[in-house]
Amino acid sequence: MDARRNKRFIVSLEAELILKDVRIASSIENLSEEGAYVITASSKLFSDFAPDTCIELKFQLPSGEKQRLNCRVKWSYKTPPHGLTNSIGMQIIDPPLSYKESLKALI
């Protein structure tokens, strides 16, 4: 049984993670009203993706609407077998109504 509260939308969106003053190119694999699953290239900053780390997620929806969401890392790991990418699950902190409405348009 799936314990998720919100429906996830499978997407493939270019994004940018902003952590302190560092910008990290990434790809969003799925989105929900309150969460995101993101993949980044492996980096020395992996330790900065520890649970509870606050991070900004910046991307553009297919509609053209730009989003900047404040997020909290829930989990992260280096993707096996070689650790060439990082997988990161994030909780969206106080998702704006405009984001929620735009997400519904992806259906």
Where are these regions (language model features)?
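Short beta-strand-centered aromatic/proline hotspots
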Residues: 25-28, 69-76
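Short coil/turn motifs at beta-sheet boundaries
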Residues: 8, 31, 50-52, 64-66, ...
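C-terminal output/interaction extensions
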Residues: 80-107
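Short beta-strands and strand-coil junctions in structured, solvent-facing domains, enriched
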Residues: 44-46, 79
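A structural micro-motif recognizing beta-strand termini
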Residues: 39-44, 93
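N-terminal helix initiation/capping motif
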Residues: 1-41, 104-107
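Short conserved beta-strand and strand-loop elements enriched in small hydrophobics
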Residues: 13-18, 50-66
